[in-house]
């Protein structure tokens, strides 16, 4: 990925994050990494935050209004407890540029809980007998809602 990459030529990214109880270190590290990497390739990025709004829906609506009132072309919602890679963000932008029908993209990430039933199944199947730390791969639980 270089500064002249056509996927980024007309892109102005807004990263929108509702923050209620503070941002996790992994989010802060990822956001700083994204800001630095975007600057290096000439991609304008703007970060917007809504602080201490107890309604996540209201916070996201407020951030959406900020996006619509801005000159940004791409909106990325990232919660303040999520780790992400700038490369994944750049890949999403490239896909959206290459495929205009992909105007809205999303990424799934696990809920903040351990799915003990999956962990127990993994133990029963012997999936982590060589390295018990591998059980972490089976602990996630996802909730996806499609409209």
Predicted regions and their residues:
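Alpha-helical elements of Rossmann-like donor-binding domains used by nucleotide-donor carbohydrate transfer enzymes
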Residues: 30-33, 62, 91
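Conserved catalytic core of nucleotide-sugar-dependent glycosyltransferases
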Residues: 85-147
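Residue-level marker for beta-strand->alpha-helix junctions and adjacent short loops that shape enzyme
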Residues: 20-22, 82, 110-112
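N-proximal low-complexity "stem/linker" segments adjacent to membrane-targeting elements
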Residues: 1-54
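Active-site nucleotide-sugar/metal-binding loop of Leloir-type enzymes
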Residues: 61-74
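Short beta-strand-to-loop acidic/aromatic patch adjacent to the donor-nucleotide binding site
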Residues: 72-83
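Conserved donor sugar-nucleotide recognition element shared by glycan-biosynthetic enzymes
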Residues: 56-60
């Amino acid at each position: 990925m270089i500064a002249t990459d056509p996927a980024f030529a007309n892109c102005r990214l807004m990263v929108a994050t509702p923050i209620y109880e503070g941002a996790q270190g992994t989010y802060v590290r990822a956001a700083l990494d994204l800001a630095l990497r975007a600057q290096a390739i000439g991609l304008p990025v703007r970060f917007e935050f809504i602080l201490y709004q107890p309604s996540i829906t209201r916070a996201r609506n407020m951030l959406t209004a900020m996006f619509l009132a801005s000159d940004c072309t791409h909106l990325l919602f990232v919660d303040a407890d999520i780790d992400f890679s700038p490369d994944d963000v750049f890949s999403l932008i490239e896909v959206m540029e290459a495929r205009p029908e992909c105007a809205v993209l999303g990424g799934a990430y696990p809920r903040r809980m351990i799915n003990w039933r999956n962990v127990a199944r993994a133990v029963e199947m012997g999936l982590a007998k060589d390295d018990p730390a591998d059980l972490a791969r089976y602990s996630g639980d996802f909730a996806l809602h499609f409209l």
